Amino acid sequence: MKKFIKSLNLISNDKKVIEELLDEKNKLLKHCIFLNTHSYVETLKDNIFMKSVLKSNYVFADGIGIHLASKIFFDKSYLQRITGYDFFENLLNNLNNCNKDKKLFFIGGEQSNLVILKKKIIDNYKHLTFTNLRLLS
C-alpha cells in the first residue's frame, strides 16, 4: 500500500483542479479518480484499473483510509479529504456559472443511477446538457 500511495499524485486543492478543467485553452481530456479503500482493493484485483489510477491526472483522497494512510506514511498533513460528491457538485456549479452551454458525458454502472443523475442536472443546471449516458458492462 505504501508504494502505491506514494506513486500517486494526490491532490490537496480541488479549486485549482476545477480551474484547470475549466480553462478554455486546455482542450486535453483530463482523468480524475476519487480513491477510497474499496477502489484501492479493486486495484489489487484489476491490473487495468490500477494502471488507470496510476495514469490519472488527478487523484483525490476520497476515503478516510486513503486520507489517513497519506498522512501517516508520507507526512501529507496538508492533504484535504475531497469526496467525489463535493468535487462534482463544485464542478457542476462552476460549469453552470460560466453562462456558456456545456456538454456532459457520463459513464456509469447502473442505468437507474444515470437517469437520476441526468434528471437532477437538467432540473438544477440550465447551462448543462448531455451528449451521452453510457453503461459499463
Write out the residue ranges for each language-model feature:
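N-terminal nucleotide/polyanion-binding subdomain common to many enzyme families
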Residues: 1-85
